[in-house]
């Protein structure tokens, strides 16, 4: 099976009985999860719960040991899938920006368009400039990553991902490496994407963002889904003791965040 634009267009995600181990250490223990087109799903939970591993399995940056992942009509876990083609329909934003330091901002946002999508340089630059303007970086296309703040670099990473016209965006703790005063500018961009109907899976410790923006919150611990549901329900009125304990520590300023 190979991915095609039409089969990916639904941008839904179906994860069934997903298992992932590193040696004898089980990181994911039978995860089931659904993301509908246009939904924002936030994954929350303590460090070591498997959130980032689950996210990285969606585009096979990590290969699961068992289970299935469907993105649209494409089974990502099919051994015959053209994963590189599938990935062209998914954008991913990492904690550490992962920009090319030797390229200016414009080139960072055009290189994949040209090499992967086959766009002309002129077309790629037009798309990149549009996306850079969208994230508030108009006029900074000639600068290099080292000349930007952390928040600006992360916004470049988002613009770079959006320049590929993805059907699905994956965010792996996109604000965790930022100074506190820079977090808001990145979350604002993500709010705008949600308002535009982008399908998003977000690993985050930003509970206010999750409660405000997420259609669904999934609380994970020890490699399993402990609780999931609408954000107001899971964050505002959690039913499971493990979720209650985690949120009490995260939301109570007198306690250290579990991270």
Located regions from the model:
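ABC family nucleotide-binding domain
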Residues: 8-231
């Amino acid at each position: 099976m190979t991915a095609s634009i039409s089969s990916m267009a639904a941008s839904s995600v179906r994860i069934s009985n997903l298992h992932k181990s590193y040696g004898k250490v089980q990181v994911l223990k039978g995860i089931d999860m659904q993301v509908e087109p246009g939904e924002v799903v936030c994954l929350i939970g303590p460090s070591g719960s498997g959130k980032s591993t689950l996210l990285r399995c969606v585009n096979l940056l990590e290969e699961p040991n068992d289970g299935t992942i469907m993105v649209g009509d494409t089974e990502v876990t099919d051994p015959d899938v053209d994963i590189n083609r599938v990935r062209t329909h998914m954008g991913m934003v990492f904690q550490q920006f992962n920009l090319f330091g030797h390229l200016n901002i414009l080139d960072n946002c055009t290189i994949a368009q040209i090499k992967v999508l086959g766009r002309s340089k002129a077309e790629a630059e037009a798309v990149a400039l549009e996306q850079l303007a969208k994230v508030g970086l108009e006029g900074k296309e000639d600068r290099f990553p080292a000349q930007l703040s952390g928040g600006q670099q992360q916004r470049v990473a988002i613009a770079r991902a959006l320049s590929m016209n993805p059907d699905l965006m994956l965010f792996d703790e996109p604000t965790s490496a930022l100074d506190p005063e820079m977090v808001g500018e990145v979350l604002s961009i993500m709010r705008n994407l949600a308002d535009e109907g982008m399908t998003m899976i977000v690993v985050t410790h930003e509970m206010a963002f999750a409660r405000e923006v997420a259609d669904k919150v999934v609380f994970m611990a020890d490699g399993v889904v402990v609780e999931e549901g609408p954000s107001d329900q899971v964050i505002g009125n959690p039913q499971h003791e493990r979720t209650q304990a985690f949120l009490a520590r995260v939301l109570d300023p007198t306690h250290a965040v579990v991270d």
